[in-house]
């Protein structure tokens, strides 16, 4: 079985590190990349086309919900 491709977008370094570590321990997931803001996250998501997204709701440039609205027609 193929691994689930995962992308994390979060501006909190601790949350990003902890979630990345937990995903790294689980053989079902492949962490394809991380981004620290919505703008970079959008580029990464469009490139990777992940199976699973972890998005921070509150980020300085764009909320997780705004990011979802921008990518929903492309992934």
Stretch-by-stretch model annotation:
Residues 17, 42-43, 69:
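Alpha-helical elements of the RecA-like P-loop NTPase motor core of helicases
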Residues 9-10, 35, 53:
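Conserved sequence signature across two-component system core domains
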Residues 37-40, 63-66:
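Acidic catalytic/metal-coordinating carboxylates
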Residues 46-48, 70-75:
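Conserved phosphotransfer cores of two-component systems
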Residues 57-59:
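Receiver (REC) domain active-site loop signature in two-component systems and cognate sites
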């Amino acid at each position: 079985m193929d691994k689930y491709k995962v992308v994390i977008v979060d501006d909190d370094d601790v949350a990003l590190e902890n979630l990345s570590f937990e995903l790294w321990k689980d053989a079902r997931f492949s962490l394809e990349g991380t981004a620290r803001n919505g703008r970079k996250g959008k580029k990464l998501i469009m490139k990777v086309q992940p199976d699973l997204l972890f998005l921070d709701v509150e980020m300085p440039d764009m909320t997780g919900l705004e990011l979802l609205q921008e990518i929903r027609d492309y992934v």
